[in-house]
Amino acid sequence: MVKRIMIFIEGTTFYTKFPMFLFSKYGYKPIGRAIEIVNGWQKQGYEIYLCSYVRKRRYKYIKRIIDFYGMKYTEILCREKGEQYSEIVERIKPDILIEDDCKSIGGQKERCITNVREEFKERIHSIIVPEFKG
């Protein structure tokens, strides 16, 4: 069975430079060896789901950035209006969820895993990394 890894993009794999990240791919900078690591997992056969804080209407924008830097993925996930990150996690059902600690925006209450229902949460290996440290 193929394992699924879901990774939050901003703050976990990419550093964002305000306000450039709003309109330019150069506002996104890969953190450390994030691209190499993610591409290695993909090469090993993992399904890679990248989750962005941009809304669905800006999907093409974030896709261009990810493709520009050469990160491999199965799917890029963006929220619909009114959709919560926890709903995306529950829909994808990743084996592993990697996200940052959300320190600059309120910490634990802002993490994707926080509001995931227990029946899903117990099957997910949650990895929290320091924000912008990769």
Regions inferred by a protein language model and the residue ranges of each:
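Alpha-helical substrate-recognition element adjacent to the catalytic core
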Residues: 1-79
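C-terminal cap/substrate-recognition subdomain and adjoining C-terminal extension
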Residues: 58-134
